[in-house]
Amino acid sequence: MLLKIFALLCVPVSILIFASMNAALWVLPLVYALCLVVTLLLAAAFLFFICALVDNTKPQPEDNKFYRAAMYLYIELILQVLGVTIDTKGLEHIPTGRRFMVVCNHQSETDPAFIHHYFRKSQLAFLSKKEAAKLPVFGPMMHMTSCQMVNRQNDREAMRAIIKCIQMIKEDKVSVCAFPEGGIIETDKLSHFRSGVFKIAQKANVPIVVCTLKNTSSVLHKLKRLQHIHVRLHLVGIIPEWEHAEMTTVEIADKVYNMMLEDLGEEYRPAVAQNT
């Protein structure tokens, strides 16, 4: 939709430019193409500008509505420009009118973008590795949209991030999304889960929305080769709070793992997988 708006806005501008040039008619498509490219470059420049204004060291007490809206718009624009095809299933079951926790397998740095795109009405905040805060554009956007960074080398800091997620859900500020594998896996195999992350859903007393992503590991590779990008996002199921309240976090991890594996297929099963 956003790309179509840009394309339509470029029509009168390119016609005006063409009229002032007094050039041959075949020049008009070139003027239009150049106008569209310049518009997209200006949009990219604006994104980098607003991200440059963010101080990642300064605590962000509230979710920033401007940066969240900008993030959604740019994700939509980028997916349209790249011509990404996304097959979805089960997303009609996304809870409405309440907070929840989303968990998904993790294949690529682009995973949050696909999840954000379809959960934009849910106001998600991601639990992410600390290193992500240093990434240009991604880091500032995550900081301004209540994402919590986890230091995987420091259990105390990791627990603080989990407690903060619980607090934000209880205060009805955001819903939370986490990747229980704990990081991007180099192969497509579903790695073992870090069960501690499920404390968020238990302590906040919210349902767990189980999702799976396929083919995102090849997104950046295909982008470099200008190949078509085809991604799949499924909502596999929902574990209500009354069900997981009586389970240990390891039992929850095992249940979620099996739900994901059943949807992804046996080719995603590793040789050895033990949730901890």
Give the ranges of each region predicted by the language model.
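Membrane-anchoring hydrophobic helices of lipid-metabolizing enzymes
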Residues: 2-14, 23-99
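Alpha-helical transmembrane spans
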Residues: 18-19
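Catalytic core of membrane glycerolipid acyltransferases/transacylases, capturing the structured
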Residues: 51-72, 80, 96-155
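Short acidic-hydrophobic, aromatic-tinged amphipathic segments that line or gate anion-handling sites
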Residues: 88, 148-151, 241
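Generic preference for hydrophobic
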Residues: 88, 102, 126, 233-235
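Non-catalytic C-terminal accessory region of glycerolipid acyltransferases
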Residues: 159-276
